[in-house]
Amino acid sequence: MGRIYFATTNLKKLKEIRSLFEADIVHMNIPMVEIQASLERIVDHKLNQVVPCIGEGDAVIVDDTAVAFEGLYGFPGVYIKDFLRIGSRKISEIVGKIGNSNATAFCCLGIAHYRDGRVVKKVFFGELEGSIVESKEDGLEGFDYIFLPSGSSMCLGDMPVDEKNRISHRRIASKKLADYMASVGIIKAHGS
């Protein structure tokens, strides 16, 4: 098997993905155009942009995330990156005024690889139930510091990496992806 790439401009995500897989993940630093669509269509569009960069035997992984606030009927969803521009403290305030802090974090991981000379694309989802809590400070990167997983006493961003990697939405999606990769010979099966 060739190389396994993770296409992202986010070095924090790259580090997290590398910690989730028992394989050598090569960084593919390619800015991608993000369309406004469903999580699955966004990931498929990203895959279409990076497939020309890989060769026979290689694989490339992309990802996207969404956060659905129950009190806002699923908003911001895939627009979470734009919504975060107002700051984590403001998001906490908005959710507090609505009176329903329930939220679901979603991760969609996509993989493209060649099989018998043809590109094969697959997507895998992970979701994590939780709630939005008051921000300790503003300007924190991402939603991890205001997202409290159900049954946890710590926000995702406050957890030690190994604990976060056991429960996160990205972990759930990456487990499904790793199982697929092992089933088609991209990586060795766990324990092999």
Curated annotation (Swiss-Prot):
UniProt keyword annotations, A-Z: Cytoplasm, Hydrolase, Magnesium, Manganese, Metal-binding, Nucleotide metabolism, Nucleotide-binding, Nucleus
Source organism of this protein record: Encephalitozoon cuniculi (strain GB-M1) (Microsporidian parasite)
Top EC class, one word: hydrolase
Cellular compartment(s): Cytoplasm; Nucleus
Subunit architecture: Homodimer.
Documented EC number(s): 3.6.1.66
Molecular function GO labels: dITP diphosphatase activity; ITP diphosphatase activity; metal ion binding; nucleotide binding; XTP diphosphatase activity
HAMAP family membership: HAM1_NTPase
Family: Belongs to the HAM1 NTPase family.
Reaction catalysed by this enzyme: ITP + H2O = IMP + diphosphate + H(+); dITP + H2O = dIMP + diphosphate + H(+); XTP + H2O = XMP + diphosphate + H(+)
A Gene Ontology cellular-component term: nucleus
Protein name: Inosine triphosphate pyrophosphatase
Role this protein plays: Pyrophosphatase that hydrolyzes non-canonical purine nucleotides such as inosine triphosphate (ITP), deoxyinosine triphosphate (dITP) or xanthosine 5'-triphosphate (XTP) to their respective monophosphate derivatives. The enzyme does not distinguish between the deoxy- and ribose forms. Probably excludes non-canonical purines from RNA and DNA precursor pools, thus preventing their incorporation into RNA and DNA and avoiding chromosomal lesions.
Cofactor binding remark: Binds 1 divalent metal cation per subunit; can use either Mg(2+) or Mn(2+).
Binding site for ITP: 8-13, 46, 64-65, 81, 141-144, 164, 169-170
Lineage: Eukaryota, Fungi, Fungi incertae sedis, Microsporidia, Unikaryonidae
GO terms classed as biological process: deoxyribonucleoside triphosphate catabolic process; nucleotide metabolic process
Cofactor(s) listed in the protein's UniProt record: Mg(2+); Mn(2+)
